[in-house]
Amino acid sequence: MDEKIINPTKKEHILVCLSSAPSNTKIIQTAAAMARAFHASFSALYVKTPASEYMEAEDKNRLLANIHFAEKCGATIVTACGDDVPFQIAEYARLSGITKIVIGRSVVGKRRFFGRPTLTEKLISLAPNVDIHIIPDSDAAIAKGKKTLFE
């Protein structure tokens, strides 16, 4: 068996994407577990968009709770500003040496053949050298009667 180990000294760096979604705590828990398993650095990124200014109070409170939860789980909290969320995530990942991104996805909607790409599709194309882990929100899918990403 002649297997080569590619860059065995490369340190893993996990990035979790923060949001006001109720399922974001599950995403944060998954990313924190990955960081522990890989003995990796752990960061949490919130991308503040112009629309963030109009977020409802309930969503703002949930976002703050998710930020505090990520911090409690050991993440370094980072905020980026911009209107292109996938670009901001990919750019932060590139500049910070992120090796894995953990992001949530509520439900899979029907995308038309020529429709706009989803946030995760854009992120995959903008960060081709980063492992991207998409965590579906099964509860939201069941509540809405839609299929999850992996069904």
Regions found by a protein language model. Give the residues of each.
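Catalytic cores of nucleotide-enabled group-transfer and carboxylate-activating enzymes in metabolic
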Residues: 13, 64, 68, 93-101
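Short, solvent-exposed amphipathic alpha-helical segments in soluble enzyme
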Residues: 30-37, 94-95, 118, 150
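Small/aliphatic-rich secondary-structure junction motif
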Residues: 5-58, 69-72, 78
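Gly/Ser-rich helix-loop-strand patches that form or flank binding pockets
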Residues: 103-141
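Structural beta-alpha unit
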Residues: 1-5, 73-101, 141, 148
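Intrinsically disordered or low-complexity boundary/linker segments at protein termini
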Residues: 1-25, 125-151
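Residue-level detector of structured alpha->beta connecting loops
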Residues: 39, 74, 97, 128-131
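A generic structural signal for well-ordered alpha-helical segments
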Residues: 35, 70, 93, 125-127
